[in-house]
């Protein structure tokens, strides 16, 4: 084994642009405290979840089996008295597509909470019905009743279908009809709108929102565009809508009925090569539009966005948001969820790990990769890649990160977030001075190390291993 013989002081003068980009994106979606959005208070996930709930609006577990078992019926007829009671007219049955998509929407709720749905005429802890109407309700596109509204109302949802309004006739992945189904089912389960507003009651706007995150970027129970929170779910001129509950919806429904930890409790891949069995969690083409929040019960899990060519920003931390496949803030991770791995695509990606032992692959492009804590396995892929570290604890001796494809002259190891521009002194052996760094490389194994004594105790408190030799000029400090 040979040691680098260079003795130099390398300084970035300050934290690098790469570190600043990582740091900025990691805090972009911070919530709560004294933060504001558009002059409105910023709510934490827990605060937003509470905002979605209403006192007494929940089903009871009558048989004590630890979950809410609901039955449902697609109505085949409705009397004039029933229609009059709801202020509507022009009944029609759900078509085959509506029925199939309603089942998928219900499944998305049962995935995240202890709720089951069975098509049956009656029974269970509560009963739900679905039907269409052609006029009434002041032109509302759909409406539903929260539990506790009263007999003949609980579990009821209605959908406008006529020659002037057709989205509810053709619900499908990521379209407004599918979101409407999932939204209305959310009401029948006990979730309200995030604010005190309803369609047909005045002309509500985002100005009526109580808090800043009341948008469809955080909750599909919201009326307001994700653009209000600087997110963008449009691609190729087509807007995508969530087909399953989003980050705040998941927290809210779990407050009511508990979390379903049986969902995706094994090793699960989201995005490309998905094994979720859920259309809205899967991608097969660069043209796909993903809008989802990850709920995962356990295992070793992966966000695989390798099939996208756009520049992406991926964050593996719980309650975080990512920019995936040309959209902005379109993928989030629910509170309490750990996702271990992330795969970028062909663009210039920014990827942030968490404190688990992550596997991060940048793919093609000039990527910025930050593994954070844990013994991470890192691949930059083709291109000029920068591996960023923000604390000595990000890669400790005994739990060191390993870069599997380091190419000297193209790739960088960026420690400027630790040194804050103070630089490093490259030596052959530690001298007891803070900032001493030792580079080693063994040609026989093609393995190198970068060890740094940040504390000045004469031993390394930071260590990263490389497959491939790193030179002093490859280190940004």
From Swiss-Prot:
One Gene Ontology term, aspect cellular component: extracellular matrix
Enzyme class: hydrolase
Record's keyword annotation contains Transport: no
Keywords: Calcium, Hydrolase, Metal-binding, Metalloprotease, Protease, Repeat, Secreted, Signal, Zinc
GO biological process, one term: protein catabolic process
Binding-site residues, Ca(2+) 5: 363, 365, 367, 380, 382, 385
Residues noted as binding Ca(2+) 2 in the record, renumbered to the chain: 299, 301, 338, 340
Named cofactor requirement(s): Ca(2+); Zn(2+)
Binding residues for Ca(2+) 3: 345, 347, 349, 362, 364, 367
Binding site residues for Zn(2+): 183, 187, 193
Cellular location(s): Secreted
InterPro entries according to UniProt: Hemolysin-typ_Ca-bd_CS, Hemolysn_Ca-bd, MetalloPept_cat_dom_sf, Pept_M10_metallopeptidase, Pept_M10B, Peptidase_M10B_C, Peptidase_Metallo, Serralysin-like
Positions that bind Ca(2+) 8: 453, 455, 461
EC number: 3.4.24.-
Active site: 184
Residues at which Ca(2+) 1 binds: 264, 266, 268, 296, 298, 301
Cofactor note: Binds 8 Ca(2+) ions per subunit. Binds 1 zinc ion per subunit.
Temperature dependence: Optimum temperature is 40 degrees Celsius. At higher temperatures, the activity decreases rapidly. Shows high enzyme activity with casein as a substrate under the storage conditions of UHT milk. Is highly thermostable. Withstands general ultra-high temperature (UHT) processing (138 degrees Celsius for 18 seconds) in skim milk, with 88% of the initial enzyme activity remaining after heating. The milk matrix has a protective effect on the enzyme activity during the thermal process.
Cited function: Peptidase able to cleave azocasein and the milk substrates beta-casein and Na-caseinate. Can withstand UHT processing of milk, and is able to spoil UHT milk over the storage period.
Family to which this protein belongs: Belongs to the peptidase M10B family.
The protein's name: Metallopeptidase AprA
Organism: Pseudomonas marginalis
